[in-house]
Amino acid sequence: MKKILLVLICICLLASQIPNVWAQTSTSKFNPYLFNWLKFSFNPIPFPNNSYIPLKVKSVVFRPQGPTAAINHNIDPHLLNWLKFNVSPITHLPYSFYIADKDKPAVYRHMEAAGSLQGSIERTITHEGMDIYDGAVYQIVLSMAGGQENLNKASLPDQYYWQGSVGDTWNIRAGYPINTFVYDPKDPDRVSSDISRLGERGFIFRIIDADGNYLVTDPMDGKKSIAGFPDNDRLHWTDWKPVAGENAWAVIAAMQVYHKKYFDSAKGVYARPLGSVELQLARELARAAMILQSETGGIRMAPLGTYRGLKKEEEKDFNENNWWYDHISTENNISWYAAFRMLYQVTGEDKYKKAMEGIKKYLRFVWDEKQGMFYQGAFYKGGQWVVARENFALDVQAWSIDCLGPENLDAWFGKGAAWALWQGAKGHSGVFDKQGGLLGVGYTDEHDRVSVEWSAGAMMALTELAKYYKNQDSQKAREALADRSSMRKSMENWHYKISQSLGAYSYSSRRGEIPFGWNSHDPEVLSLASTGWMIFVDAGFNPFWLI
């Protein structure tokens, strides 16, 4: 009987003329309910058992000075409460954003300026989306806070990622051949989209619907259809991009949760379940990333098949399916450096150290010796890799200090490199008051917009610099702390009290285009990433390191 039922369901699926749903968008003709039932009824995803083995920690001498600071767990309960409050009632995954009901009409109208189609997509993402980077920040905050309830919540995203589906979205893992994402052109099947091929699956899509919806409704006016919407007029989830940087943070979060759960600091070992979800997921995503590692040592932004609408000037060098594959992001690689470091520290496997050395090689390639800063990235053109000079990226500079540490930067690029890097970054993106006090930093070459999240990353960098210079240059240490203090005070301009028990921080100080493919939001749009990073700053917790 089961075989007959299976055949009937397969006929139904074929009759529905399923398109390639994993290019830019999907279509409402696809029936995710049928496919979910079919996939999991006949081939459920196994979860690891709970037997334990000891695993010694690999001694990694990358950070002679130790953690940023003693973790003081100075977590504002209003912020932590908000993180745990702003979750889907259906899946219990966190939302990336929050907008108070009174602010929604104006905020949503501003998004309409991009056109009804793009406005609808942006509103849907803001209303019910979860960027997996934001989800990682949520996981790390909860693991840092500790306690069984928080650890259970922190573990939940990894359970979904390992399962490979969320609600009606039957597959959140990008590979081949169910969808046509190719990591290795010589062996497309090397990274799979078959969610039953554990350990061989591809990246997670960067933004997923936290409610698990495939079909969506425009939150501004309740519309369910728009003429000309991609693939089908019926509104549906459209963001299917498996981007390297977001997946690095999925690994970082998994390793932070794993470290919190299983590390015995007294014995210096991990007492872990055989094949814990966190470690298995981290290994699997790292495998896909290493396959994307180019001859420069840098990890490509995404596999072949990741869609991008091209600008006119890009059409001669790229097509819609290879733009992401032929670009490398320095920010993405800094994140992967931290992810590989954590995996090497825990497992001691040399392949992760080798991957780190590759990224180190890439970072030397994109170091602008003249300005003493990192280029945003690189791209493949005319048979060779070329550095991307078009746009300055503030987060690359701050995160390099956070992740690599001032001591390593000085060792790699010369004495004083870390300090000069910060001074240059502040010159490009600092926002100042009339007295010259530093209010925050923006995204690129600008002095009139503050990113709360990127400012928090800069404050973390200043903490690292102050500690590094404390015993060798007290003047630099004082300057770093002064900049940090000035920015921290300024951040309260974008701190919103939602209720007596809930508070959160804005995404940014104003709406505007960011030259890296997205928009900053009105200050009324509260952000999981901003709020989480402010918690990191106040707690003295650097998420790039296992502490």
Residue ranges and their predicted role:
Residues L14-V21:
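C-terminal segment of classical bacterial N-terminal signal peptides
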Residues D134-M144, W249-A253:
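Non-membrane alpha-helical segments in proteins
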Residues C10-C12:
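Cysteine-centered motifs
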Residues W37-Q118, I132-Y133, E149, L156, ...:
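Extended ligand-binding clefts on enzyme/binding-domain cores
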Residues H127-E128:
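Extracytoplasmic Gram-positive cell-surface binding/anchoring modules and repeats
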Residues K2-V7:
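Sec-dependent signal peptide recognition
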